[in-house]
Amino acid sequence: MKQCWLCGSNGSYDPLDKHHIFGGANRKKSERMGLYVYLCHNRCHIFGKYSAHQNKDTMLKLHQYGQRKSMEENEWTTEDFIREFGKNYI
């Protein structure tokens, strides 16, 4: 069952969006590697005070989560991650 990564909601009140942790040039790579989370559209993804697109701390936590997940699943070092995504978030 899908739930919001930030607040835990199941999306019954505010529909869930798929948020690619590493966007822009890395969006397709995020999709392929499963580096995405579900977020409530209004409150946690786009418009809320702590939403991924409005709050630097939330975005940093997402990037750190994505880096740890990809490093664990691919048995990468920090240097391997930087080669793939261009930056260290941890």
Q: What is each of the regions a protein language model found here?
A:
Residues 1, 57, 88-90:
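Short, Lys/Arg-enriched, disordered terminal segments
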Residues 1-17, 42:
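Short cysteine-rich loop/turn motifs with clustered Cys
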Residues 9, 45, 75:
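Residue-level marker of positions within ordered structural domains that often coincide
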Residues 14-17, 35-36, 66:
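Amphipathic alpha-helical interface surfaces
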Residues 16-24, 41-47:
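Histidine-centered catalytic micro-motifs
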Residues 22-36:
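Short linker/helix segments within small regulatory modules
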Residues 36-62:
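Short Cys/His-centered divalent metal-binding micro-motifs
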Residues 63-90:
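Short flanking/linker segments adjacent to small metal-binding domains or redox-active Cys/His motifs
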